[in-house]
């Protein structure tokens, strides 16, 4: 799977559910959820794999320490640049599906993919990061907050469809655009595979 994190599992199940109707290509990082990159994934920039009829392009990224903000930023930026490069080599795509992780950059990757591939862009929002950051005052700079909001609104505007995982996020989208020219939006809740997830 692309990543053992819950979002990675959901995206894997989504890809598996669509593979009979679409040719699916997934761009993701090499396994590195805990910050460590295995030696076999440090030898080249891209690793192309085929997982159950799904083409997977894994990007090499530097390891990181979750407590070290600088190493985390380096890791995220390496993914962003690598994903842009991978987008140029994946061939023709009819649809680009991107999620709101990493914050802000996930949406911008979708915008880039739409432009580069002349494809339709579906933006799946798991969290509205600028609003979250403002709520907890993680970043005090109004300029930085405003810039982040501008870029994420751009991603929403450029999408052909925004999918949120809850009604509250759809309401936030409407508030973000002050109910004027709100991007087309659909609510699809995240799901679980009851055959694989069960109470302990």
How does the language model describe each region?
Residues 1-52:
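N-terminal subdomain of nucleotide-sugar transferases
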Residues 95, 160-161, 184:
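Well-ordered beta-strand positions
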Residues 100, 166-167:
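Helix N-cap/beta->alpha junction signal
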